[in-house]
A protein has these predicted regions:
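HTH-adjacent hinge/linker in prokaryotic transcriptional regulators
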Residues: 1-10, 22, 26-33, 50-51, ...
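Glycine-rich beta-strand-to-loop/alpha-helix junction loops that act as flexible
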Residues: 12-15
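Conserved SAM/SAH-binding loop-helix junction
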Residues: 19
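Conserved phosphate- and dinucleotide-binding cores of soluble alpha/beta proteins
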Residues: 25-27, 39-198
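Short beta-strand element of Class I
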Residues: 36
Length: 198
């Protein structure tokens, strides 16, 4: 399980975090997760999520294409909180574990979230691995609080290399299973020792 009862969660915008949010809603409706509060910059699913838990939208400038809020007001509002868990997307992760986004605003938002979270789950499709994007916001490293959640399509050589370097990686049937109960038989955990920090 990525989330436990009482978690205060930041949920990023983007397709993969959206799927995680849907799985989170399913657990809340089923009663397997309770007393959760969510802060999000996503306009895509905040209304639906608010029907099953307490949801707070960040401040910020609307980005219609991404259906989210960003910019300095968003960074400042996020910095007021402390999250027990956070879910972020990634547009790219290079071979050394550097996490990156397509633009500075998205990267700065991610940096701010990492600085104010106890544990961070970066959700990335295996097709984005070993392929850097434009602006970095953190790095997988041994002993850090960031966990990479990806699918079984990750190349074996890359997974072995990252394990040797102490990165923490969870392998699921798909990254969209990230919010589901890890005991439901639909996903498996691959814990290769930990990492990351902005």
């Amino acid at each position: 399980k990525l989330f436990v009862n009482g978690d205060k969660i930041f949920l990023d915008s983007g397709t993969t975090p959206l799927e995680c949010g849907m799985a989170l809603m399913a657990r809340l409706r089923a009663g397997t997760l309770q007393d959760v509060s969510v802060v999000t910059n996503s306009l895509a699913f905040s209304d639906s999520l608010a029907r099953v838990c307490t949801v707070t939208l960040t401040a910020g400038r609307i980005r219609p294409k991404r259906q989210d809020l960003c910019g300095i007001p968003a960074f400042e509002s996020i910095a007021r909180y402390h999250f027990s868990a956070a879910v972020l997307g990634a547009d790219g992760i290079d071979g050394d574990g550097v996490l990156s986004s397509t633009d500075e605003d998205t990267a700065q938002l991610a940096r701010t979230v990492v600085e104010h979270s106890d544990r961070v789950y970066v959700l990335a499709d295996s097709r984005k691995l070993a392929r850097p994007s434009f602006v970095s916001y953190g790095r997988l490293r041994r002993g850090c609080m960031i966990t990479l959640v990806t699918d079984a399509g990750i190349p074996g050589a890359l997974l072995s290399n990252w394990r040797r370097r102490g990165f923490e990686i969870l392998i699921a049937e798909s990254a969209s299973n990230a919010g589901q109960d890890g005991g439901n038989g639909k996903s498996k955990s691959e814990k290769a020792e930990a990492e990351t920090k902005a």
